[in-house]
Amino acid sequence: MLPGDVLLVSSVISYLGCFTKSYRVELMDNFWIPYMIKLPDKIPNTLTKEGANVLSLLTDDVIIAGWNNEGLPSDSMSTENATILTNSLKWPMMIDPQLQGVKWIKNKYNKTITTIRLGQDGYLDLIEKCVSEGRVLLIENMPEDVEPVLDPLLGRQLIKKGKAIKLGDKEVEYNPEFKLFLHCKEGFIYNHLNLIPMQL
């Protein structure tokens, strides 16, 4: 990847997830790409050419077909969302009233996923187990107000040189294979997360 490609791809992953398709296109076509073209010292890239697809650098037809087989809808917005979701360093929050993204995530990780809702019996123990064993955790129907005990997890605030995380009064061993997916049906925003609107 050329430096300009890295700049555009990282911008898409970091900032576009929470926007609608039309606003994503507007930002790319009317702001970001024209800005890159007008720079006096051009940054080498392949993405300012007509018809270039930023996310094609992160995925291909085989990966997309796999996602579709796992239940992801085949429209371009869902493909963009999945690409952003799978490449983000922040935990993704899926705004998903129709449960399209939830269905896909459950199918994609069907053998290793644990699904919980905050407040259910023993949910903190399940979170600790997933974190320490490197499992995939899906928290469904996230409330607008999240318990402060989860802040270190949402913000990936690792301690002991990245080997542990504090959950409440416990230090839990952090397995780097751990993955967290969050789901809500409403569009409230968390600063620690990468929002992915999965509605059609």
Where in this protein do the model-derived segments appear?
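Conformational switch/transducer regions in large eukaryotic molecular machines and scaffolds
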Residues: 1-200
